[in-house]
Design a protein with these regions (language model features):
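N-terminal Rossmann NAD(P)H-binding glycine-rich loop of SDR-like oxidoreductase domains
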Residues: 3-23
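Adenosine-cofactor binding site in Rossmann-like domains, unifying the SAM/SAH pocket
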Residues: 26-42
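NAD(P)H-binding glycine-rich loop region in Rossmannoid oxidoreductase-like domains
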Residues: 41-72
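NAD(P)-dependent short-chain dehydrogenase/reductase
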Residues: 104-108, 112, 116-171, 200-201
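A recurrent short beta-strand within the Rossmann-like NAD(P)-dependent oxidoreductase core
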Residues: 129-130, 151-157, 169, 176-189, ...
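C-terminal "lid/loop" region of Rossmann-like NAD(P)-dependent oxidoreductases
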Residues: 181-185, 192-199, 203-223
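Amphipathic terminal alpha-helices
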Residues: 224, 236-250
Length: 250
């Protein structure tokens, strides 16, 4: 298969790229790190799938730069949706669990608009909080593993491992288009308070801060649609953290 990945050098994109190359698929990369801007995107007509993951994803930064988030998350995605629709190419694009509280931030608004402008058959992937090797240094799970966290919050977060995310994407790609929903929550369906993971599971003694008003207090996914397809997550965040942080406390 010929698969285009935007954001192919990013966290999820790089994992997908390596998995699919190993399976013998032809991967077309489109990434700013390769000098390719989304506004200039060219999608070949013989492409089987476009996996659109390139986006600005920092909720806090979106408060400070709303116009930039509109340009990078809305204008570019709307264009990709149009091109894929006109060429008959199946599109899966990164939405976010933020759509459930979309009015709290420009980032959430941008993802809500992405879902509203999608054409029939195009699928939004409402990722919760993805973790694993290669995640941004600012992400909490990585900080806990590296013993770099200075505080925890009272947020409830649905942490999903990147390998489980990839399994969901592949499962949906293998479904007939007429059987797909417009969007799917992509998480484990299990929420954990961040301070519980940090202090009770990892054994730290971090101060606890209140969550910011522009962030959802709880992003636990409703994975009923995924479970209806017999999918269940394979990696549990509590087990993952216990394994990764045990050495820190020996």
């Amino acid at each position: 298969m010929k698969i285009m990945i935007t954001g192919s050098s990013g966290f999820v994109g790089s994992h997908l790229k390596e998995r699919w190359k190993a399976k013998g698929h032809q991967i077309v990369e489109w990434d700013r790190k390769e000098g390719k801007e989304l506004k200039d995107i060219v999608i070949d007509g013989d492409t089987n799938y476009v996996i659109h993951l390139a986006a600005w994803a920092d909720v806090r930064a979106s408060i400070e730069r709303p116009n930039d988030y509109w340009e990078n998350n809305v204008v570019t995605t709307t264009n990709i949706q149009r091109i894929c629709h006109e060429k008959g190419i199946q599109l899966f694009y990164a939405s976010s669990s933020c759509v459930h509280a979309w009015s709290k931030s420009p980032y959430g608004i941008s993802k809500k608009v992405n879902e509203e402008t999608a054409f029939p058959g195009q699928v939004g992937l409402r990722f919760t909080t993805v973790y694993g090797e290669g995640a941004r240094d600012t992400m909490m799970i990585g900080k806990l593993v590296r013993n770099e966290a200075n505080y925890a919050t009272n947020h409830v977060r649905d942490f999903i491992h990147v390998s489980d995310v990839m399994d969901v994407i592949e499962m949906l790609m293998n479904k007939p288009v007429h059987m797909l929903e417009p969007a799917y929550d992509v998480g484990t369906g299990i929420g954990n308070r961040v301070d519980y993971l940090a202090n009770d599971i990892c054994g730290y003694d971090l101060p606890v801060k209140e969550g910011q008003s522009y962030e959802a207090l709880d992003n636990t996914a409703d994975i009923t649609l995924l479970r209806d397809m017999k999918w269940e997550p394979k990696v549990n965040i509590v087990d993952y953290l216990r394994e990764k942080t045990t050495v820190l406390h020996q």
